Design a protein with these regions (language model features):
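Bacterial Sec-dependent N-terminal signal peptides
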Residues: 1-22
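Glycan-recognition and catalytic cores of secretory/periplasmic carbohydrate-active enzymes
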Residues: 20-530
Length: 532
């Protein structure tokens, strides 16, 4: 009898030791994650500081780029791709700058660039006036759509309602007065796919702004554009001889699927009407748009299957977001299989790949899209690829913080911040300090966080929430461009077991979301476990 008792006691003790060893391994990994997260944060902050030195002294606006167009701010580049991620960086890492200079730039941009109502046009620092004497409606429509989708949407995903979401809703309201379904964008500057790009931009904006506001006007407009494209006459894979599966064209695929996700919840009859067209479009892209690894070509003819541009699209993840979303809605396994095939090919075949003719932007977009999908399908080799490729991206940064000196530099910060939030499991410091190392590991029902600092620090550890729900009111967290991944989302109304250096207490989720107070002494390391 006693022999069995001691055996059980021994086994129980062994299990406890194993659990403790596993937990310590998680805390050790969290510390390692904190080192790379810290580098991502520092590089993003350095980008912000570098670009602020290039701002126009009179207006405070940043130029379109540093090699040409140095005298202008435009909606579809400076406003859409660079400035928003300066704002985002400041919101995480430099609160005084966020509340001050970043808001000032928004106010100045709104005052100086609004030309047709609240719709922005290109502003010249040198002329102290609009760059073009005459109003070019195509340029204004294109710039407005790009500013909303690429710039103001990600800020709203991160911040929720804010002055930037108000700017977007103002642009959207005034754009509604001059366009319904965009069918003509004049000017060769915008490439061969400007019409579908603007249509896709609007669909993505309308889908998310409908959920944010519940304004039926945005739903009706989105359905109007969806009805146009999801039809016998205008389905992109039937009507287009050139279908771009990279940015500046692939937006239409993602946009149609985002609006499909909306109607799948609020209008089942419309969802049923659109479903055959959505599936046909995606099936055609799978049949004619991929290479042997399941990644997409830059551009194909969907009618003949001709590959027009054989370069592999760095935006493959954006298009796969659409496939995975339809998989979530319709449970069509082929769309998940397509995602898994592409992801599984990355580490073996696309390390240090030349995504966009040597540009950092190609790496930034490829990494962002992959992180979205890795959240849903955590394949080990994908983690290895992400950890490898972020270093390739970081090598583009110059000593002054500038990346390549054009508007695409903003995407460097966007992706670096996303990477850091992965390595911190969505947690942040209320008052970021570059000397404080903190990282996390999310494992099933718990997140393990390690913090250390060479100097004393006090502040709050802010946990990540269900951003899709609390910021945009989305009904489910489908993969989408410009979202911020939820690695360990805290729910405000639930209770969690918080253990700090071995001492446990129950804490409401709302407290964790607001930030839990912590203090670090010089050279101290703190281990925090949060358990569902």
């Amino acid at each position: 009898m006693f022999r069995y008792f001691y055996l059980l006691l021994f086994l129980f003790g062994s299990l406890i030791n194993r659990a403790q060893n596993n937990e310590q391994a998680y805390f050790d990994q969290a510390l390692s994650n904190g080192k790379v997260a810290n580098e991502a944060f520092r590089r993003s902050h350095h980008f912000l500081q570098g670009w602020l030195t290039k701002a126009d002294p009179a207006t405070g606006l940043i130029p379109r780029n540093l090699t040409q167009s140095t005298c202008i701010w435009n909606a579809w580049d400076a406003a859409a791709d660079n400035y928003p991620f300066m704002v985002m960086t400041a919101s995480m890492l430099d609160k005084p700058l966020f509340e001050g200079k970043m808001r000032e730039i928004l106010a100045t941009e709104t005052r100086l660039t609004s030309r047709v109502g609240r719709l922005p046009d290109t502003y010249s620092f040198c002329k102290k006036a609009f760059e073009n004497a005459e109003i070019d409606t195509s340029q204004i429509v294109f710039g407005s759509a790009e500013y909303m989708k690429d710039g103001l949407i990600p800020l709203t995903e991160w911040l929720g309602p804010s002055p930037w979401s108000e700017r977007m809703l103002g642009i959207l309201a005034d754009l509604d007065k001059i366009v319904d379904v965009p069918t003509q964008i004049k000017g060769s500057f915008f490439g061969n796919s400007a019409v579908v790009e603007v249509g896709g931009d609007l669909l993505q904006v309308l889908a998310r702004m409908y959920w944010l506001t519940k304004n039926p006007k945005w739903l009706a407009w989105g359905i109007q554009i969806g009805d146009y494209y999801l039809s016998e006459a205008h389905l992109p894979t039937r009507a287009l001889q050139r279908l771009r599966l990279r940015d500046h064209g692939c937006e239409i695929v993602s946009g149609l699927v985002e609006m499909y996700a909306v109607v799948s919840v609020v209008n089942p009859a419309k969802k049923k009407q659109w479903q055959p067209y959505i599936h046909e479009m995606l099936d055609t892209i799978l049949a004619k748009g991929r290479n042997e690894h399941g990644l997409f070509y830059d551009e194909v003819n969907p009618l003949t299957g001709e590959v027009i541009q054989k370069r592999i699209a760095d935006n493959f993840g954006y298009t796969l977001n659409a496939f995975y979303t339809v998989y979530l809605i319709d449970k069509k396994a082929a769309y998940r299989d397509a995602t898994l095939k592409a992801l599984s090919a990355l580490n073996a075949n696309y390390r240090n790949h030349d995504w966009e003719s040597g540009s950092a932007d190609g790496y930034a977009d490829a990494i962002e899209g992959t992180m979205n999908l890795y959240l849903r399908e955590p394949i080990t080799s994908v983690k290895e690829w992400l950890d490898s490729e972020i270093k390739v991206l970081w090598n583009f940064q110059k000593p002054d913080g500038i990346i390549e000196g054009w508007h695409g530099d903003g995407n460097f910060a966007r992706t670096s911040l996303m990477y850091a939030l992965w390595k911190t499991a969505g947690t942040q410091l209320s008052n970021w300090n570059q000397e404080v190392m903190y990282g996390a590991v999310a494992e099933k029902n718990a997140v393990y966080i390690t913090l250390s600092s060479p100097k004393a620090w006090s502040g709050k550890l802010v946990f990540g929430g269900q951003w899709h729900k609390q910021n945009l009111h989305l009904p489910f967290d489908y993969p989408r461009i410009n979202q911020f991944q939820e690695w360990f989302p805290i729910e405000a109304n639930k209770s969690y077991e918080l253990t700090i250096d071995g001492k446990s207490l129950n804490v409401k989720g709302s407290v964790l979301l607001a930030g839990y107070p912590l203090q670090l002494k010089p050279q101290q390391t703190i281990q925090v476990r949060c358990k569902r």
